[in-house]
């Protein structure tokens, strides 16, 4: 049965997900902050600014009016950067949405906590919640290339509803109840992609890249264990799957940012060269604090934090990583 769904955030990712829902026959309202942007999307039937190679289905309409976007919807999907997430939740509070789904990846910028905590604290009554994550570049989703993702929810009925809404012969969602693990994988992989990009920018080779991905997964797993995440989640699509994609393909903004650092660019110049949101640069500090609060050792992610914050030159950080005291590969 067709639903009416609000997608809040008309960047590349929000537009790609909205296009999947629209192609599946759902009525989609794509919200952007700018009336001019909404008018252009409606007139041109494409989001030229963020996803120019993705023609939009007729069932999708764009609007800059939040009340119009939300009115009469079955559920809403948030796809804004993590830095804008809390502000949007505050704007949603008067509307008291009953079902909130998000595809934002990262930790909350003010608290350094998980996005589900922001939703629970910011909306009263607390809605049914779900998060979408996994190996999924927006351009490929928009073009209809085969993609598999994870939908984690605190409510089995909402998980099933979101899975049904997205599922087609090119987009395969899997369900999960582990919201913490799915959110964690989506946040940490961005920081690790900065590390692998920097390694490749320095010309450190394929061996180093493989080591960073593998030991990076160990860091995600250690933090996940401390936070109560399901270990299987972290070797699934939202963990290892997204990590592999983001660390090895230049469609990743985080990887391109790290590569620019490895080539000698300053943080500011590297960010400018990417030209759009680099979640890993923002998440590094929040992840550093989160790991410290839980006494979890995350040397690669900590290296990224030190480099991005300007505390340590990249070459020195790499040397310190390699010179750490030898240890067993797996913790007891």
UniProtKB/Swiss-Prot annotation:
Main location: cytoplasm
Gene3D superfamilies assigned to the protein according to its UniProt record, in alphabetical order: N-(1-d-carboxylethyl)-l-norvaline Dehydrogenase, domain 2, NAD(P)-binding Rossmann-like Domain
NCBIfam families reported for this sequence: PRK00094.1-2, PRK00094.1-4
Descriptive protein name: Glycerol-3-phosphate dehydrogenase [NAD(P)+]
Any GO BP annotation: glycerol-3-phosphate biosynthetic process
InterPro entries: 6-PGluconate_DH-like_C_sf, 6PGD_dom2, G3P_DH_NAD-dep, G3P_DH_NAD-dep_C, G3P_DH_NAD-dep_N, NAD(P)-bd_dom_sf
GO molecular function list: glycerol-3-phosphate dehydrogenase [NAD(P)+] activity; NAD binding
Keywords for this protein: Cytoplasm, Lipid biosynthesis, Lipid metabolism, NAD, NADP, Nucleotide-binding, Oxidoreductase, Phospholipid biosynthesis, Phospholipid metabolism
Gene: gpsA
PANTHER family per record: GLYCEROL-3-PHOSPHATE DEHYDROGENASE, GLYCEROL-3-PHOSPHATE DEHYDROGENASE [NAD(+)] 2, CHLOROPLASTIC
């Amino acid at each position: 049965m067709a639903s009416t769904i609000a997608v809040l955030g008309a960047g590349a990712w929000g537009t790609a997900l909205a296009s999947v829902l629209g192609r599946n026959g759902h009525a989609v309202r794509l919200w952007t902050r700018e009336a001019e942007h909404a008018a252009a999307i409606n007139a041109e039937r494409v989001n030229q600014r963020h996803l120019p190679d993705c023609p939009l289905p007729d069932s999708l309409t764009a609007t800059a009016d939040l009340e119009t976007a939300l009115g009469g919807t079955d559920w809403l999907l948030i796809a804004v950067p993590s830095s804008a997430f809390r502000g949007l939740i505050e704007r949603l509070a008067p509307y008291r949405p009953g079902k909130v789904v998000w595809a934002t990846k990262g930790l909350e910028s003010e608290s350094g906590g998980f996005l589900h905590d922001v939703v629970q604290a910011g909306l009263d009554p607390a809605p049914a919640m779900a998060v979408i994550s996994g190996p999924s570049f927006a351009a490929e989703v928009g073009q209809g290339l085969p993609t598999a993702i994870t939908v984690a929810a605190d409510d089995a009925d909402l998980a099933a509803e979101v899975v049904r809404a997205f599922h087609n012969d090119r987009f395969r969602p899997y369900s999960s109840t582990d919201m913490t693990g799915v959110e964690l994988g989506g946040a940490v992989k961005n920081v690790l992609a900065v590390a692998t990009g920097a390694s490749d920018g320095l010309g450190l080779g394929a061996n180093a890249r493989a080591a960073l991905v593998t030991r990076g997964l160990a860091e995600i797993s250690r933090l996940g264990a401390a936070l109560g995440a399901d270990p299987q989640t972290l070797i699934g699509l939202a963990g290892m799957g997204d990590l592999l994609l983001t660390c090895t393909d230049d469609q990743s903004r985080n990887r391109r940012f790290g590569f620019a650092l490895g080539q000698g660019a300053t943080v500011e110049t590297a960010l400018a060269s990417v030209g759009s949101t680099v979640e890993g640069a923002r998440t590094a500090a929040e992840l550093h604090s989160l790991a410290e609060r839980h006494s979890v050792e995350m040397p690669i992610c900590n290296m990224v934090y030190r480099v991005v914050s300007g505390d340590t030159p990249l070459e020195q950080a790499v040397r310190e990583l390699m010179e750490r005291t030898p240890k067993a590969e797996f913790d007891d």
